[in-house]
Amino acid sequence: MLTKGIESGDRIAFQLPGWCEFTVIYLACLKIGAVSVPLLPSWREAELVWVLNKCQAKMFFAPTLFKQTRPVDLILPLQNQLPQLQQIVGVDKLAPATSSLSLSQILADNTPLTTAITTHGDELAAVLFTSGTEGLPKGVMLTHNNILASERAYCARLNLTWQDVFMMPAPLGHATGFLHGVTAPFLIGARSVLLDIFTPAACLALLEQQRCTCMLGATPFVYDLLNLLEKQPADLSALRFFLCGGTTIPKKVARECQQRGIKLLSVYGSTESSPHAVVNLDDPLSRFMHTDGYAAAGVEIKVVDGARKTLPPGCEGEEASRGPNVFMGYFDEPELTAHALDEEGWYYSGDLCRMDEAGYIKITGRKKDIIVRGGENISSREVEDILLQHPKIHDACVVAMPDERLGERSCAYVVLKAPHHSLSLEDVVAFFSRKRVAKYKYPEHIVVIEKLPRTASGKIQKFLLRKDILQRLEQTCVEA
């Protein structure tokens, strides 16, 4: 990187699956003081152009081949839209780099650093992009001290040591994978087992073969494993616990884990403050089943009302956290930062919760207008903006509908421009595909209605649509 003109503080973006090359690039950034910007493998041209320009990335690493696509070839024609990007590097794990510089060539042509490059703990270490209520991805800025505080507290609470073997099925461009799958094992000298493409069979095989002691991920991962275990028993005696976050754990899943002797723990946090509430390993089962843990070491949690005044135990309000793990702000977004962070260092999550007398919290809902699909945030507004570009659609609103496996899926209510028009889910999927956005953002259910319910001031009454989709799903179950 240094030979390519990269300096301390420059942003280095890398869009890689769970490969060892991800770790190599991350460590290289740490060694020279560059800022890591890991990106989700599912992102396509639209998201990539936005994010690379937003963070002003100077170097971008992507696979030459992954899942029958050639990510490097997707970005090369878009260089004229990326004025800050100086170098595109093909990670030639599965296919040679024919149109760009290759990572293997960089490694072959260069020697290890001879002079140490030092950085301050409060300097920027990483920018993790997350979707939220504002639509386009936001860059969460984390310092070296943020990351160290987060992962040290996390490892201490769960008694993780060098003897543990982490299984990480989540994408490394997500906070879960980046922090808990890669960074935490570095800090304690543990081993990490990564998956580039998650399938229940591959994950179960690795859990058994590698004698993994802990697994981390969203509810769908454990849901799929439980389904497979019914047909294909496996020796998971080494597994100490499965840590689940990103969405509510269904009671059915928790009960099945209990019956199989798998300790299922809940963790709560966000990219901005990750993770800051975890249960204790020796807590009673009721804590695992009915709470999302209590504040990690060095972290404070409070529940506030609409005026951000602290509420007493048992009252529902917005969850807020403060501590050395809390991010320094959103990249180049001062207004969003000022709204999320106050002058005293409190981060207001937009999530609703209750806290009991012992300090344990339970997340009860969200103020934020997002859909959590298998642990991934989908901005309703972003999906709505794309729907409104469809030539047949006059008005649109996207809400979450419950899903047993993923927690939530997106449901689009649309008003057509002409009454005689028709619109199918297949039509919408084809339209989103042409827009080159990530597949997990596609609407998965379409309801065509005459008009959207609105207040007198013109705001859409989403709660009525959420109620409507629940009734429709219940009716479908009755008819089935």
Language-model segment annotations:
Residues 1-47, 377:
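Conserved AMP-binding/adenylate-forming
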Residues 148-165, 173-214, 224, 228:
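Conserved AMP-binding/adenylation subdomain of ANL enzymes
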Residues 90, 95, 107-129, 136, ...:
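Conserved pre-ATP/AMP-binding loop-to-beta segment of ANL
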Residues 187, 212-217, 226-287, 300, ...:
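Gly/Ser/Thr-rich phosphate-binding loop
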Residues 294-298, 307-340, 378:
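Conserved ATP/PPi-binding loop(s) of AMP-dependent carboxylate-activating enzymes
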Residues 3-4, 32-104, 418:
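Structural core segment of the AMP-binding/adenylate-forming
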Residues 125-149:
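Conserved AMP-binding A3 loop
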Residues 14, 43-50, 60-62, 215, ...:
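AMP-binding/adenylate-forming catalytic core of the ANL superfamily
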